[in-house]
Structures are given as structure tokens and as C-alpha cells.
């Protein structure tokens, strides 16, 4: 039996763990589902501390649990957690800029909820520069019961797939 060492698999090229899609690889109507993520008390506390959202409703669990049944999660945290699932899987290494984002909250999200999202490509638009394009998407975020808790519409600038002549060693 042959053993494999790190040197055996080493190369000069980095191997991306998550590689995003280029602008040219998307089609309007295409849909992608993220993995699921449970929102924990620690997530809420860290977000409140970083964002400065020191609202009584988020800080005092006892004051809101009677009304909602559990501690509420700010909509901004829900959105950022979904961005944290979308960006590494669809846009890693290809996303250049978030150009526009609009969120609509439909139902409350609470500590202990598990969320995921479906990303639907709604628009593909080239830019003046041939190395990039704009992707529009509608993101539907659902909880563990399948209830849509938030929808987002975004526009992002992505790079296009490099032409073979642009890749080092490719045909000229």
C-alpha cells in the first residue's frame, strides 16, 4: 500500500474549496438552494454587540418571549446569515461588488430557527467592460417549517469567465 504525503498532492496552483460561478455560467430562471443554518443565542449576542443594536427587544429575552414565544432575531442578522451561505457557494472568487439589495421581512425569525434560501437568477446584463457583468437575483428565505420569512432582491457585479487567450499559457 502506498502512502500519500502532502508533497505528493502539492501543486503550484491553489485548489479552491468553494469556487463561485462566473457571470457567463448563470441563466435567467436558474435556481440554487443554500445549506441550512440554525440561529443560536450566541449568534444574536455577537451580532448585537458588533452592530450596536442595543434595543430592549433584542437584549431582554424575558420581555419578548411572552409576546413572540422566543427571542426575536433582527432582520439584518437574518439577511447577513443568508449572505454568508450564498457568497461562498455561488460567488467565491467571482463576485466583485454588491450593487443593490432590498429586503422585505414577512414573518419573525427567532433564536432556534433554522433558515435556508433559494436564489433565483432574474437578470443578466453585460457591462461596458468585457470582463464583467451584472446578475440580478431574488432570494427567498424560509424557516424550518417552510414559511417564507424574508425575500431579497439583489444586483451584483461578477467577473466573466476569462477567455482562453487571457489565461496564462492559453492560445493567443
Region locations from a protein language model:
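Mid-chain, well-packed structural core segment of small domains
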Residues: 92-99, 104-111, 117
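Conserved hydrophobic positions within beta-strands
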Residues: 36, 82, 105, 119-121
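HotDog/MaoC-like acyl-thioester-processing domains
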Residues: 2-27, 109-114, 118-172
Amino acid at each position: 500500500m502506498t502512502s500519500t504525503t502532502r508533497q505528493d498532492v502539492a501543486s503550484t496552483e491553489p485548489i479552491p474549496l468553494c469556487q463561485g460561478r462566473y457571470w457567463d455560467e448563470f441563466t435567467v430562471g436558474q435556481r440554487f438552494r443554500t445549506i441550512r443554518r440554525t440561529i443560536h443565542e450566541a449568534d444574536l449576542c455577537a451580532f448585537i454587540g458588533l452592530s450596536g443594536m442595543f434595543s430592549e427587544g433584542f437584549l431582554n429575552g424575558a420581555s419578548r418571549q411572552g409576546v413572540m414565544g422566543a427571542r426575536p432575531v433582527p432582520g439584518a442578522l437574518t439577511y447577513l446569515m443568508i449572505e454568508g451561505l450564498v457568497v461562498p457557494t455561488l460567488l467565491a472568487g467571482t463576485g466583485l461588488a454588491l450593487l443593490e439589495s432590498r429586503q422585505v421581512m414577512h414573518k419573525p425569525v427567532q433564536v432556534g430557527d433554522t433558515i435556508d434560501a433559494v436564489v433565483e437568477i432574474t437578470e443578466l446584463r453585460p457591462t461596458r467592460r468585457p470582463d464583467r457583468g451584472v446578475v440580478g437575483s431574488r432570494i427567498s428565505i424560509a424557516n424550518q417549517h417552510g414559511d417564507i420569512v424574508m425575500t431579497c432582491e439583489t444586483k451584483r457585479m461578477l467577473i466573466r469567465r476569462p477567455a482562453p487567450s487571457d489565461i496564462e499559457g492559453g492560445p493567443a
